[in-house]
Amino acid sequence: MKIKKGDLVQVITGKDKGKQGKVIVAYPAQDRVLVEGVNRVKKHTKAGQTARGSQTGGIVTTEAPIHVSNVQLVVEKDGNKVVTRVGYRFDDEGNKIRVAKRTGEDI
């Protein structure tokens, strides 16, 4: 997967189109990422016992994973944020390096 934990990404489609956020968790097996402040959903929780004591019921707002095809990486060039695709190249030792396709710089 070309998007990693800690990357700054922008949502390119859906209800949160145009929003930017940091990737909190990447789920490569499902091709999904959890982005900070994006795809917020409301979960209804039931009151009950937890390991730390009683939990009150109610509605909790939290982020839900979004498919990796719906986000693009944001890199900074000359003080401006640029949305770009991600490519790969190999260095002299054979290590795989991520490259911003629009700027040509290593990530």
UniProtKB/Swiss-Prot annotation:
GO cellular component term of the entry, any: ribonucleoprotein complex
GO biological process, one term: translation
Keywords: Ribonucleoprotein, Ribosomal protein, RNA-binding, rRNA-binding
Subunit structure: Part of the 50S ribosomal subunit.
HAMAP family: Ribosomal_uL24_B
Entry-linked PANTHER family: MITOCHONDRIAL RIBOSOMAL PROTEIN L24
Organism: Streptomyces griseus subsp. griseus (strain JCM 4626 / CBS 651.72 / NBRC 13350 / KCC S-0626 / ISP 5235)
Single annotated GO MF: structural constituent of ribosome
Presence of keyword Glycoprotein: no
SUPFAM superfamilies per the UniProt record, alphabetical: Translation proteins SH3-like domain
Protein name in the entry: Large ribosomal subunit protein uL24
Gene3D superfamilies hit by this protein: 2.30.30.30
Main function: One of two assembly initiator proteins, it binds directly to the 5'-end of the 23S rRNA, where it nucleates assembly of the 50S subunit.
Pfam families found in the cross-reference section: KOW, ribosomal_L24
Family classification: Belongs to the universal ribosomal protein uL24 family.
